[in-house]
Amino acid sequence: RWYFYINSAPWLPNRFHGKAVVEGQRKFMGTLWNTYAFFVLYANIDNFDATKYTLNYDQLPVMDKWLLSKLNSMIIEVDDDLDHYKIPEAARALESFVDDMSNWYVRRSRERFWAKGMEQDKINAYMTLYTALVTVAKCAAPMIPFMTEDIYQNLVRSIDKTAPESIHLCDFPVADEKMIDKKLEEDMKEVLDIVVMGRACRNTANIKNRQPIGNMFVKADHSLTDFYVDIIEDELNVKNVTFTDDVRDFTSYTFKPQLKTVGPKYGKQLGGIKEHLSSLDGNAAMDELKAKGALVFDVAGTKVSLSEEDLLIEMSQKEGYVSEADNYMTVVLDTNLTPELI
């Protein structure tokens, strides 16, 4: 059922194959169930009862506020998608939230659940994850009725007999827009993007995460506060993360013509174009491309204008550095291992 929801709109043809079904089950339903099982395991150990506590937003740390912001943004998105019969979009929004909840929030908050006693920080973590699990179950109930019913009966009905008898008798969740903080969501997305690129750099350099790294440099649209930098350093096992406006000391670019598009437009000048592109200062050319949207130059009296679609761009790095980049961010990892790091 989930495979058909998320794969394509109901009125379009759908190719069915077993591997895709298994992958869909693992990616969403398996992740949701594992997160629920994580909560239940530690809630049972601590005899946690959500009816005895309240969720005080003003007392919450940043990670809790981020998850609640994502949760309420997801409610709005899923509700609107279902209103307009956008089934795949609603399913993808649910899947994306569950991925963030499991692979980022729980990952970053596990030690809070392991703490001894029931200090306020631990209560905050329990209440935040409890709220997220119950709410996402209600949002997903029309699509996965049986799993969400199990979650609801165990998390809600077992401690509150006044609650509706079934999740399918509950109202669809309504977003609390006061909990939505788009700046917080954007900053955390940048953290996640940097972490993904940093891991890719480690993989390229064949350096495992347990090996500390001295320095990482990030060129992005805006820098992040120390709170987020500390998360990046911890996730990537890097001693120092530095935001910079220029990574020229570590990287450069090479340009070649995209023959499919450049050939039909400038066939006779193709040789001259290749020669010109090979002679460019890579960083200066990339700056021009981003600023003007094209590289403009003259070849044998013919004006040539090449957009990003007309170019094959490769990023090269200096020895001892590995980099990853997309359209708005570059991450450079210093792979030089000093005796102190080893």
PLM regions: where:
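Alpha-helical recognition segments enriched in aromatics with Gly/Pro capping
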Residues: 1-14
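Feature 926 captures the class I aminoacyl-tRNA synthetase adenylation module centered on the KMSKS loop
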Residues: 20-342
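Short, solvent-exposed helix-loop connector elements
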Residues: 13-21
